[in-house]
């Protein structure tokens, strides 16, 4: 498994070039409206979306666009992660967390893919990054953070879909665990 996309911008450009990303240029409220649109797109295996003018809680338009549904299908997620089948990413992660040292001692060449993946993962230190081009005072209310559901306790930065597999039955569970 190699990570095929090194930056979010490259991934979004790829999606847009392939007709898998739409842009909404009209203002869209980050409380419920953006989430409802993304929910419909996910349920219909639709394209990724960029809200170019997300409307914040105070009614102002954020200068920062909001991207949603960028991993909205299994195929899109596998492509983003450079995987050829659905279990590859999980299998590689398990292999990295619990490598079979005995197998590697007998057949050292089997460790090469694992070593390649591990070496590709460490952070790279840079003096300046693209994220430092825009400087602003810290104010989280100025970020287009969605509030997705009416009973949510607030706006959540993360909304991951976590897939787990029961080791006995093999059944899968899809859950959301947010911060």
Task: Name every feature range the model reports, one short phrase each.
Residues 1-179:
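Extended, highly charged
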